[in-house]
Regions:
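N-terminal accessory nucleic-acid engagement/regulatory domains that precede
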Residues: 1-22
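Walker A/P-loop
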Residues: 48-68
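Inter-Walker segment of RecA-like/P-loop motor cores
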Residues: 106-149
């Protein structure tokens, strides 16, 4: 019923806000994250439609988006919240964060190809398969491909999930990764969801795509949850970018070792995997951990957890 839905969202929202309010506000970054989160909570009071959440990298976009979705779902009695991302690596990271705050796995359905199954018996497996077929869980974490399949594919399995999109909150993360040739079709889908299905759509990104100058633009206005503030973005400018393309891999390895004597972290972007592999072979004696996205998800998750426990 509507009352039960509202109570469920209220409980989840209260739990989430309590955890968010427990965060420290000592540093400028902490203060900026809290301001972004509070703005998301306030914006959730607005009526449904299409929203834009543009937050600097490191601004707590996942948790702020979760707060908006829960608050909006509570006020307008939405059936479910659907979190989508075009990239599996981002989806896995977001899923872990969302689970920490929802704190009830029975309310969450993850639907993507990288999922590690944890069902202990056939009954649990049957229940999960049914939820995957119907998308009737309160919180769904999935890929943008799965969402678009429901809208555009004629497969029975996709059509069976269609009703679950109605009267929901759909948060689309890293929306800038949608290929430019697909933006027009994507905008048509967003318009249909918002205008026909009663869906509140949230487009999340630090670098929003241009959806106004295409053949089928998103019908406006798209409301900004967090107004653009140059001072806010300046707080999150924590990187120093250097081009080392003229160096050999051996020179880059030496550069990295020397740089890490003065900084806490360093990211090296290579064009090819074999370059990354060779670079790691030059650095592996320096006690650097190896995380390969070519490995299965379970291995990389365990490796990351092990590394975190060592750091602690």
């Amino acid at each position: 019923s509507g009352e039960e839905l509202e109570q469920m969202w209220f409980t989840l929202l209260t739990r989430t806000e309590e955890k968010l309010n427990a965060f420290s506000s000592k540093t400028p970054i902490d203060q900026a994250r809290r301001m972004i989160s509070n703005q998301c909570g306030q914006a959730a009071e607005q009526a449904g439609g299409v929203f834009r959440l543009s937050v600097p990298t490191g601004g707590g976009k996942t948790l702020s988006g979760l707060r908006f979705a829960l608050a909006h779902a509570r006020k307008y009695r939405k059936q479910r919240i659907i979190f989508t991302s075009p990239l599996l690596s981002i989806l896995d990271q977001n899923a872990k964060e969302i689970r920490k705050y929802i704190q009830d796995d029975s309310l969450i359905l993850e639907h993507h190809s990288n999922l590690v199954r944890t069902e202990q018996n056939s009954e649990q497996l049957d229940e999960r398969e049914l939820l995957t077929e119907t998308w009737e869980a309160p919180v769904i974490i999935t890929t943008l491909v799965q969402l678009l399949n429901i809208l555009f594919s004629g497969k029975t399995t996709c059509i069976r999930r269609f009703h679950s999109l109605c009267n929901s909150v759909i948060v689309i993360d890293e929306v800038q990764t949608v290929p430019s040739k697909m933006l027009s079709m994507f905008s048509l889908a967003v318009n249909f969801l918002a205008e026909i299905c009663g869906v509140t759509v949230v487009l999340c990104s630090a670098t929003q795509p241009c959806t106004e100058q295409i053949e089928h633009p998103i019908h406006g206005p798209i409301r900004d949850i967090v107004p653009y503030d140059p001072a806010l973005w300046q707080v999150f400018q924590r990187t120093d970018i250097q081009s080392v393309g003229s160096m050999s891999l051996e020179q880059i390895a030496d550069f990295a070792v020397k740089k890490l004597e003065h900084v806490d972290s360093l990211l090296i972007v290579c064009n090819k995997k074999n370059q990354s592999e060779h670079l790691y072979s030059l650095l592996k004696d320096k006690s650097f951990a190896l995380f390969s996205l070519s490995a299965c998800l379970l291995y990389t998750s365990d490796a990351a957890d092990e590394r975190s426990s060592v750091d602690l």
